[in-house]
Curated annotation (Swiss-Prot):
This is Large ribosomal subunit protein bL36. It comes from the Bacteria. The keyword Ribonucleoprotein applies. Keywords: Ribonucleoprotein, Ribosomal protein. Belongs to the bacterial ribosomal protein bL36 family. GO terms for cellular component: ribonucleoprotein complex; ribosome. It holds the Pfam family Ribosomal_L36. The gene is rpmJ. PANTHER family: 50S RIBOSOMAL PROTEIN L36 2, LARGE RIBOSOMAL SUBUNIT PROTEIN BL36B. InterPro entries: Ribosomal_bL36, Ribosomal_bL36_sp, Ribosomal_L36_bact.
Length: 42
């Protein structure tokens, strides 16, 4: 999982990317291609 400053670029990498919010953090998840997972930095 990558930790990045802005999820906008991570969101558009693949059409199956979804943004979810868990415990106050914002994540990008992708069920079909899990290597696109990312988390907002702060």
């Amino acid at each position: 999982m990558k930790v990045i400053g802005s999820l906008k670029s991570a969101k558009v990498r693949d059409k199956d990317c979804r943004i979810v919010r868990r415990k106050g953090r914002i994540y990008v998840i992708n069920k079909k291609n899990p290597r696109f997972k990312a988390r907002q930095g702060y």
